[in-house]
C-alpha cells in the first residue's frame, strides 16, 4: 500500500516541504532513496526498536521509501517520526485519513520517546504557508513552533500518542501562544541592566552613542576599571527588536539548536561579549 507523509527540510533559516512516500509489498528488504544522509539511513534501526517497544510490529515485508524532492539532501534524525508513521500506515496499522492534513517531525529514541529537533520555527512557518492544518513535533519544541498563528501545533512525547491520534483514538490539545504578548513579556527584562552603573558618565555616553548608531567600541584601561562590567550591560540599551526582527532572530537560534527548552519567541537583541583572552 502506497502512502504519503509530509515533513520538512531546513535550508538556511527557511524550510521546504519534503514528501515521504512509503510502499510495502512482498519481500523482506528495506530501501530508502531521495538523497538521505547517514543519520536518515540509520533511522531504520531506531524505528524498528521504537515501534516494537511500544507494542506494534514492524512490517516483515519489502519497504521502499522515497523522499522528494530527490535533489535536496535530507539531513538529521528529525525524519524518524514521519518515516515511522509512513511505514506503519503503509502496513495498514495507521489510518491514512489525517496524513495529508499534518506535517510531522521528530527524532525517535529506542523506547519510542520523541526527542527535540532543530529548526522547529521555520518548519512551522512553512507548514502554515503550505496550508497544513497542523504540525506534530516534539513537546520540547512546541512553544517555539506555536508562535506561528493559524496553525495547530501539537507537542508529543511518545510515538504511541501520534499513532493513537492519527487513528482517532485520542484527541490532542494544540498549544496556543499569544505571539505579541510573548514578545512584549521579555521585551525589557534583562539580568544585567545599564542603570546599575554608577559614575563613569563619559564612558556611559560613549556606550549610548555606539549602541544607538550601531558603531564598534573598544575599551582600554587597567584591570578593575569596569570595562567588562559595562560591556556585559550594553545589551540593555541597544535598540529593541521589532516583531519581524524577533522572528528572524528566533529562526536563526532555532536552526542552530540554541533555543532553550520551553522557550518561544526571542525578544531581546542578540549580544555577544567575548573576552579578549
Task: Give the role of each language-model region.
Residues 205-277:
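Conserved ASCE/P-loop NTPase catalytic core
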Amino acid at each position: 500500500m502506497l502512502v504519503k507523509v509530509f515533513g520538512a527540510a531546513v535550508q538556511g533559516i527557511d524550510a521546504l516541504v519534503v514528501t515521504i512516500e512509503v510502499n510495502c509489498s512482498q519481500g523482506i528488504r528495506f530501501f530508502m532513496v531521495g538523497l538521505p544522509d547517514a543519520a536518515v539511513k540509520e533511522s531504520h534501526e531506531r524505528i524498528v526498536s521504537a515501534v516494537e517497544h511500544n507494542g506494534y510490529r514492524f512490517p516483515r515485508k519489502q519497504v521502499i521509501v522515497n523522499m522528494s524532492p530527490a535533489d535536496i539532501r535530507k539531513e538529521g534524525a528529525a525524519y524518524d517520526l514521519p518515516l515511522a508513521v509512513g511505514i506503519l500506515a503503509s502496513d495498514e496499522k495507521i489510518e491514512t485519513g489525517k496524513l495529508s492534513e499534518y506535517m510531522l517531525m521528530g527524532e525517535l529514541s529506542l523506547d519510542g520517546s520523541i526527542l527535540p529537533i532543530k529548526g522547529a520555527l521555520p518548519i512551522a512557518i512553512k507548514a502554515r504557508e503550505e496550508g497544513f492544518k497542523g504540525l506534530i513535533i516534539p513537546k520540547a519544541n512546541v512553544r517555539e513552533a506555536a508562535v506561528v498563528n493559524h496553525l495547530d501545533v501539537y507537542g508529543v512525547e511518545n510515538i504511541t500518542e501520534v499513532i493513537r491520534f492519527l487513528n482517532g483514538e485520542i484527541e490532542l490539545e494544540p498549544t496556543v501562544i499569544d505571539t505579541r504578548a510573548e514578545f512584549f513579556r521579555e521585551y525589557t527584562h534583562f539580568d544585567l541592566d545599564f542603570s546599575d552603573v554608577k559614575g563613569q558618565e563619559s564612558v556611559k555616553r560613549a556606550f549610548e552613542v555606539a549602541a544607538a548608531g550601531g558603531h564598534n567600541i573598544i575599551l582600554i584601561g587597567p584591570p578593575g576599571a569596569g570595562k567588562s562590567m559595562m560591556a556585559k550591560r550594553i545589551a540593555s540599551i541597544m535598540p529593541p527588536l521589532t516583531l519581524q526582527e524577533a522572528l528572524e532572530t528566533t529562526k536563526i537560534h532555532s536552526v542552530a539548536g540554541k533555543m532553550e527548552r520551553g522557550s518561544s519567541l526571542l525578544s531581546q537583541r542578540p549580544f555577544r561579549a567575548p573576552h579578549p583572552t
